[in-house]
Amino acid sequence: MDIPSMHDHDRYELVKDIGSGNFGVARLMRDKKTRELVAVKYIERGEKIDENVQREIINHRSLRHPNIVRFKEVMLTPTHLAIVMEYAAGGELFERICNAGRFSEDEARFFFQQLISGVSYCHSMQICHRDLKLENTLLDGSPAPRLKICDFGYSKSSLLHSQPKSTVGTPAYIAPEVLSKKEYDGKIADVWSCGVTLYVMLVGAYPFEDPEDPRNFRKTIGRILSVQYSIPDYVHISVECRHLLSRIFVANPAKRINIQEIKNHEWFLKNLPADLVDLADRSYDFEDPNHPPQSIEEIMRIISEARVLGTGATGDYFGDSVDDMDLENDVDPDADPDVGSSGEFVCAM
């Protein structure tokens, strides 16, 4: 099934499909002029161009950091809105863990340091991600892979929006306060999700899912609210690492460690790569000569036009199935226990 060409100038050529979800499809494309590979996320025009899509584009556009997938531009096809971004050749961090089973403490720290670097930058730009998870962390193709945070569809900017209170995110990664349906600090909730990511890298399983009943959503939520987790005996990690996890997995967000405290933690600082030490002091507001930044006005005009169903759009261009369940609506802790959570063990042990 062919995606229509990019409007009238047909800048990109298709290389291959690289993913699909409830948003549509993602494709690897090549810039015909520069030969650069880019990832293009296609979202069907019409009702799917909602507030989440607009928020993702506007927030993502403002972020320029080595640990965040670079936004390039948005374009229109006759049937789709296309979001063009940096291509991360190494795939998802999730896949890497699945292949490995779990990481050594040093390897987990290597990726966690980069994750915190990217999240810290987002927070400094007054943007909380709200859906941090392994599937939203990509890797470039280098031998010592650089982690890249992606997917800002649930992100919230305190400069543009009120404090978040909706329950969004992926079940296994949700912080206790997010389940309360009251206002919460999205930055502190992001810290919890970073902790879940660290735990999964170390253990190869989600911290708050019952290994005997991983799809029992009600039980998962109960374990999150009571902070019921443990580190299996077969996983050998340092006292310092256990201490950091215990400071992240704190139900009261006011008592939870924050990003700056994580960056000063003994475990985090060990073997910290030199290029991460002074990232906070650098400016990454560079311009790509091949992709001069689009103005907010131009982007909003394109988004507005994309809300109108294009000629030739069928309304069912892509299937609606999606493997990982993101929560777009408020969560009821007493929901039907048969509702699937984010999944079973990341890999069979």
Swiss-Prot record:
EC number in record: 2.7.11.1
Keyword Heme: no
Keywords recorded for this protein, A-Z: ATP-binding, Kinase, Nucleotide-binding, Phosphoprotein, Serine/threonine-protein kinase, Stress response, Transferase
Description of the deletion phenotype: Significantly reduced levels of SnRK2 proteins activated by NaCl or abscisic acid (ABA) compared with wild-type.
Gene3D superfamilies xrefs: Phosphorylase Kinase, domain 1, Transferase(Phosphotransferase) domain 1
Domain Protein kinase: 12-268
Region of interest: Activation loop: 151-177
Function as written in the Swiss-Prot or TrEMBL entry: Involved in early responses to osmotic stress.
UniProt record similarity statement: Belongs to the protein kinase superfamily. Ser/Thr protein kinase family.
Protein name (Swiss-Prot/TrEMBL): Serine/threonine-protein kinase SRK2A
Organism, scientific name: Physcomitrium patens
Gene expressing this chain: SRK2A
